[in-house]
């Protein structure tokens, strides 16, 4: 598996993705796994080669939080059903060499990515097959992508979406692409006018009162999210040759056409 792994980090997740991430976790850098608990049930763990040489619990948590933020960003983009949900919560750090838990450290809020992901080297020997780990390795190859998925790890609101929009425009300027966003021009105009306008969003607007007229057709948060996330998906395909996976370990059922009375009777018999 991973070379020189020293720490296992206990992680909580409320979204039943442990088995998906714990299986087929062959990789050369960062991964999750599950173990049976002594008192029943299963525990969820994470580790990374990027923390193996560290000794400070504070440094380990700080670095691991940034790495896990990338996975959080992946799930935020793929799973559009929950805004601002924490898919991963760090609990404890266990030193495998000394067989002891490190002192608990209060998790600090991460404002930006400053971990050097370039030290992660893809290995043919440990080439990932799980689509989440494949996507993670692709993200780690480019600083723009690591920052993008860090931004995605934050609560979905107008401010978060606008920062992502700004970052995408900045990236497009660096590659002198002036046309990529043209198909979205009308919707982006509605989005920016909505996000900036205090009369529409109040405290949640990007600006205070400016005297500008509110947009004639404000775009709600759900549609704003889908707009920016669709742009991200197309950007990944066209600029990085990255296709997002169709399945990521979470299953949803559409109950709109289900006879709920009949379903209730069936469940009683199970």
Which residues fall in each region the model found?
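Short charge-dense sequence patches
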Residues: 2-22, 110-118, 143-147, 172-184
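Intrinsic-disorder-associated interaction segments
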Residues: 50-67, 110, 125, 180-184, ...
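Acidic-enriched, low-complexity/disordered segments with a strong bias for Aspartate over Glutamate
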Residues: 10-12, 29, 36-38, 53, ...
